[in-house]
Structures are given as C-alpha cells and as structure tokens.
Amino acid sequence: MTGQRIGRLLCVLLAGYALGAGAQSAAPASPPSAAPVPVRGIDTLQRIRDTHAIPIGIRDASFPFSFVDRDKRPQGYSVDLCLEVADAIKSELGLPRLEVRYIPVSPDNRIAALQDGKIDLECGSTGNTRERQKEVAFAYTTFVAGIKLLARRSSRISGIDDLRGKTVVVTRGTASEKLMKDINAERMLKMNIVVAADHDESFRAVDQGNAVAFPMDDVVLYGLMAKAKQPDDFAVVGRYLSVEPYAIMMRKDETQLEAIVDRTLSRLFASGEIRRLYDKWFATRELTVPLNPLLKEAFAMPNTYPAWP
C-alpha cells in the first residue's frame, strides 16, 4: 500500500471516528537541572554524547501518559516510550551511561522548552496538529484520542449544545482551548470559557461547580475521573469534537534524532512490545481504555498524520 493510499485511509477513518462517535539500562534520573544552552543549529546528538545526559519534558498530572507519583517519580505511558528512546540513543552513541533528566513542562511552555533547548524530547500527552507542525516535529503516533466533555452526572449535560450560555473550563495551551473558542464563535453559543493552568485545575473547576464542563481528550478525562474521590459522580459525554493523535515532540530539523526515535517506535510496534506497554497503563483495575481502531492502524502503519479536523 502506498503512502498516499495509507494517508487517505487514515483520513477516512479519522473522519468516521470523529463524526460517529529512567530507561532500565540508563542511569537513575536526577532532579531537574539548569536549562541547557539554546541549541538552534547545534547537533543535539553530539551534545548528548558530550554530556552523557538527555533532558526530557514531562508533565505533572497527565495520567496515565506523564505524571509524577506520590514518591515524586515520573511515570506513564509516554515516559516509558521516551525511556526506550533514551536506551536506544545510549546504544547508538556507544555511551557507557546516559542520564535522563526530567524537566517539568506545561501545555503553555512545552514548545518553547523544546525550541530554547531546555528539553530534547517532550514526553507528555501532546497532540500532533497542523499548527504545531509549523513549530516542532513529531515522531510516529503512539496514541489516538478524541475530544469529549467531562461533566457531573447531575448536570444532565449530554453534548455541546447543552453548553449554551454556560461556563466551560479549558486547559491553557491545549487544542481543546482553541477548538472551544472556535465552536463558541461559529455556533454563537455564548459560553463563558475560563482558562485553567493545568488539567487538575480544570477538573477541580467542574468538581467544585465553577464550570459545568471540561472539554479535553477522552483518555485524559478518564484518567482524571479514575483519580477522583467519587469517580461515579462524573461522566464523559457527547460526540467526538475532534480526533487527535499523540506523539513524542522534538525540535524541527533534528533528522538524526528523529530517525532514532522513529526506529525505536517501529521496533516496539513490530515486535508487539507496544501492546505490553499499552496494557500496562490502559488495561488496569484503575483505568480501562480499549485499544481503538485508529490506534491499531497507527501501530500497523506508522505515520505522523496530524489531528482532524
């Protein structure tokens, strides 16, 4: 199957889906250190070779992709994937050790952290969008999510039209922030859209009655519900407002680094190891998210297609 045919197939699948519905061999991680010198135009792999360290961006509260546990240790699906990449870099460069430095980032500063050289990989829950592709590069898709609404069951919110004239919370710097502002203008819903600093703050706004709904990628919403004191008080509702592939984010024009990342992911996909990692985080007693058809396609035919619409 040609690349163009695969691309058309994925676009059809995306449209239908939206409308119808430290590495084990690496050294232990150290606390975040001072930001590296900006690296525009510098060979990142050479810097890693010289310093024996790679700074990766992580999130504090993007369960189960990238979060800090009770012992303040970075964990998650995306973190595990980046540790696989770190191990591959260590091997490819012939390094006896490679220190993984965890640098906290937020939706608001993650792209700047890459561009300024504070991190070499962003390992969170970042969607691959056309707008972001203008500023950064994305590795192969590792998850496919869709934006839905989180609301209290008692609110009787069932979809976007129920939000007319109501207060809605979005997380700053996310695709859902722009999407909801666009929908608000296009449909003249007169929503009061408030912006929170992170997903935990957005969830609290709904929990405390300061907003009736929180639009975000469904898997992130399920993760927040799983951690709530009363998960059954909440529901993820409505049709998909968009479909968004997640991927590891890198600086543009880092062709050698990008090649290592994609080779590592291709190996995980082809060997089936990706299913073990998926089940580790998405098929648990705490959180169960079935592998959806779009992600199966992404594992079978690795790609960097952006979000739809």
Language model region names:
Residues 1-11:
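Bacterial N-terminal signal peptides that target proteins for export
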Residues 27-45, 80-88, 154, 161, ...:
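Extended ligand-binding regions for polar small-molecule ligands
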Residues 29-122:
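Extracytoplasmic small-molecule ligand-binding "clamshell" domains
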Residues 32-39, 178-194, 232-234, 265-309:
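Ligand-binding clefts/hinges and TM-proximal coupling segments of bilobed small-molecule sensing domains
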Residues 55-64, 74-91, 127, 145-199, ...:
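Bilobed "Venus flytrap"/periplasmic-binding protein-like clamshell domains
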Residues 60, 143-154, 218-219, 226-265, ...:
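Periplasmic-binding protein-like
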Residues 83, 87, 94-162, 301-309:
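Acidic, polar ligand-binding/catalytic clefts
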Residues 108-109, 123-134, 179-186, 207-242, ...:
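A ligand-binding cleft/hinge motif common to bilobed small-molecule-binding domains
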